[in-house]
Amino acid sequence: MASLLLAAFFVVVATDARPTPHPLDLVARAFDARDRYANFPTYDQLPLHPSFPTKAAWGVWGASDEFGALNHITRATRLAARSEIQTGRAISLNLALGVPDPPINPQRPPLIHAIQPFAGYQDDILTLNTQISTQFDGLRHFPYSTNFEQSTYQFYNDLITFDDIVAPGGTSTLGIQNAAQKGIAGRGVLLDWGGWKDAMNETYDAFSTIIIPTTELDAVARWQGLDPAAFTVPGDFLVVRTGFMKQYTALSAHAQAVLPFREGAAVQWVGVEASDATLRWLWDKKVALVGADNPTFESAPLSGVIDGAVRNLHMVFIGGWGQSIVEFMDLDELAATCHALKRFHFFFTLQNLNVVGGIASPPNAMAIL
């Protein structure tokens, strides 16, 4: 009986993360699925309350929403994306589960794959950190914080606290089961920044801080024959190829082994700029998901000035907008195919693990052209 009472206590505490009344109760948009963009705020109108974190979209989809940017996905967007399937060619966007090896983040242990034989059959046993390879970042992964102090964590819609994740009997709120049950499918669009640089005979080091601004992403769109003002529609999945994995794959085994052990300011790689310009550009496009072939979508070190504050895209995307990120995508075959077909839109699917209360997952992502 005592254990049952203790479990009940933890559940009650964990589900009462927000104070009452909460500013969200005052400013949350009355979201109507029949007209999901009625009274939709502009980027300049974020956040909806001055007490919310930098450019947070808390309340935009309702005070208790757990889907965030996935609300841009509808039956209509999925149906419209069917027209992108013209050849039937399917391309996996996932690296082998043990790649990179060792993991780029040295705090994450590498994959352990064991075979368990039985009489007449064999099983696998996998022990892995879900973010060592191609990965889908869920909404419990990267909150707002000050100097990464746990006491300052702020998660999407202020629905949970750090203790709700790690304490016994914590909630499943904002877990990756939401994305798994939502059904992530629709139209994808590739911006091949790495190919664009190659076409201009401009060499670059993907393992250095090269910041990709939206002006260059628009230039890539034009180079691909797309209209920068109209190459996306709400609910699209935007994928950027930086060339990071192409350069990584070409390394010697020794160079791959030492790359993760850079420290401090030496931890650098190419990626999208963390700035108001980037966030405004993406907010206006109403994309459901972003992804790239680098470790973080944004450039490293992860830092930029957003609305006058030192922030990064991870904080605003995940903690602010409820927008997941797919990282370490395998995009080289997709890019080659898109260039050959002269088409850069495709049908995109992603089915993450249905782990209740999960933080991240291999994405099992696929493009069908």
Model-inferred region functions:
Residues M1-P21:
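Fungal secretory targeting signals
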Residues R18-L369:
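Active-/binding-site microenvironments in catalytic and ligand-binding cores
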